[in-house]
């Protein structure tokens, strides 16, 4: 193995050693969401024609799990290394900033997709959701995990203590996730909130992902693809720049 592959393997091993916490726990949480929201809101929330609310909810929960866990992987790894003071050992290696980025974001994609697959496997029994366009599912799943993995890397570099990381997650990631259409179609919202939703990049990730299941979406999947791709490019550029300049990692 070369340098980036070793770091990638280390990051995979890091979350896999506590797999019950990092993989199984989010799956259990998604089951609870499905049981509670699917039961309470079935028939009460307007979604797509001929699509039950429980079936509509499933892709949203899968993508929400992918995004949140991809972010948690890179952000928690970096903040733990900074707080414990062992990040210096990585800095002593000849790894380039690109190798760091690929390893951290790549491992975040693996964790996000693993959790998403687990949520899909378990919750699919609640509603036999079709797979109209599997390629769209894979594309948006991968891009969403990479985007949040990159965002987690930026947050991990910025935060200097766990409180700052918790604030970033509680005031940025969680609100944007819950207001992205996981539990509802934006067409059920008043016009003003529909317009606000279009400024949320998480909405396009979830809407494009959901298109792969039903073949219908609130906006064109091609528009979602372009916007998510643009957001991924911006986040990647910022993350690479911060790593290259040693932002908050070099004394």
Go through each PLM region and give its residues.
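Hydrophobic transmembrane alpha-helices and immediately adjacent juxtamembrane helices
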Residues: 1-135, 139-251
